[in-house]
Amino acid sequence: MDRNTFTGLFLIMVILAGSVFFMKPSEEEIKKEQQLQDSIAQRKTPDQKKSTDSLFAAQQGLEASTIDSTQMTGPFGGAKVGAEELVVLENEFIKASISTKGGRVKSVEVKGEKDYKGNPLVLFNGNKNKFGLQFSTAGVNINTNDLYFLPQSKESINVSKTDSASLTLRLNYAENKYIDYIYSLKGESYQLGFTVITKGMQDVVAPAESKLVLNWQAELPQKEKDMKDERNRSTAYFRLSDGDVDELSTTSDDSKELGKTDWISFKQHYFSNVLIAKNGFSNGSLKVTTLSSDEIVKSFAANMDLSFNRQDVNSYPMAFYFGPNKYSILKDQGLDLEKQINMGWGPMKWINRFITLPVFNLLEGFNWNYGLIILVLTILLKIVLSPLTYKSYVSMAKMRVLKPEMDEIKAKVGEDNQTLLQQEYLKLYKQAGVNPMGGCIPMVLQMPFMIAFFFFFPNLFELRGESFLWMKDLSTYDSIINFPMIPIININHISLMCILMTCATLISTWYNNMVSGATGQMKYIGYFMPLIFFFVLNSYPAGLNYYYFLSTCFTFVIQFFIRQSINDEKIHGMIQANKKKPETGKKKSSFQKRMEDYMRQQQKTNKK
């Protein structure tokens, strides 16, 4: 360095040092400036100070911290690092823990409910649940699930019955450019309001993109005792904008592309996680996968599109439903959420929705034990169906009285010529005025009610955790013996109520065979069916087997008293009197007409 350069640098340093010294404000000027700043600070409202401190200063403080600056480069660089914190938003129904990482709901506890181990019931928890907006900017793919949001408040919020509260988390991009997640909760609700607001993002989101993709993934843990049954009743549901509610497969891995959609649901047996879009999702996709895990029931994934408009502010109002699959509660939410509950198909669905469920809810109002409610429900059903039972039994009595004459016809005609044998039987039925299907039709009319309960009780949330007698939980099986899984038949326990139901059915079958005089294959089929039902129903809820046990017992008692009131000799006399009536005065039943037409067709075929 030459002398001139050294002299120039020295003079510059002297000038800078002198300017700092001579331009320093006096103590009086410093005091006046401090008073002015204090006055301005006092005029700021607490909300303005909180907003400024929590949503902007915190971000600036983060950037000034000792975090490695190389991690904070690129779009949303200041939000790529941070420490995860949880803010709790709860009421008397649910407790939602909201994470600053991703601004997502990290876990939800349904208050007042327990899992099969007796622990507080948590719908989902931990990092196995992901939730975020996906888009690209400046050639970089962004997923807000991986970024850190700034909470409006870090204090937990407990909402009382009549109150409501909200929590805002902000993801800053730059000044006046951010994404807000706003959660809101009312005092008595299973719904957690959720609104996404984008501010100044029209120049941030890549010009080629017209949507934000909302990605939601969850691995839902086991909550019920029977993992296999819970898996078979867990899947994803959705409602399209045309009002059609549909589901993915419950028994295998499945996926589906969706059009405009109102809501999606990650449904387990007795609880659902629903995301409702007030303005609908423009498109989307759902996927359900069964993992090889002893703790996770199923893995759910959804990618739902939110239309993005090139404007300063976009708002996407939504809501979560985190709660039980109880028909009345789901129906109160609107949007057909109750259609997630499998009430059966065809007439069984209508029986359960408009007869069984209203009567059950009426009995529930008496605050009886649920075992007693099922008992009363069974009695009421038997009273309503008793006319059909009586008619069926009278028809069976007529066939029993005719059996000796039918045996004579069989001996006379022989069993080789079945066509002629059936013709002779029809002639006898016509003369006696007996409809051979008269005993079957009333029983067939009762079958929809029997099948309806097969769907009703296994999906009835009200039975969950309710005990009766030795049954600790009416919503699952009551095992008295447990053992390793037996291949082929796939059972690892014995249900006491299922045994009682099977025994009652076998006794009823024996009595009916004795009364009706059943012989041959029909006699043994009657004993075979209850054994099949045992293996089918052994893992079904104790409440269902309890109902079938009561139903079989009451049917047996009713049949016994009807049998005592029916006089076979009187019926025989009526049949003989009917035989003496002229043929023209006897009206043929539709069954007899069809059988006669069938016989004539058979005769024509045989002649050819």
Write out the residue ranges for each language-model feature:
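Intrinsic disorder/low-complexity segments
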Residues: 42, 58-59, 65, 110, ...
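Generic detector of low-complexity/intrinsically disordered segments
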Residues: 18, 57, 64, 149-152
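Soluble non-transmembrane domains of integral membrane proteins
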Residues: 81-339
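Short, Gly/Pro- and small/polar-rich lid/capping loops
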Residues: 48-84
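General structural signal for secondary-structure boundaries
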Residues: 69, 78-80, 90, 249, ...
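Helix-loop-helix
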Residues: 1-56, 98, 187, 194-202, ...
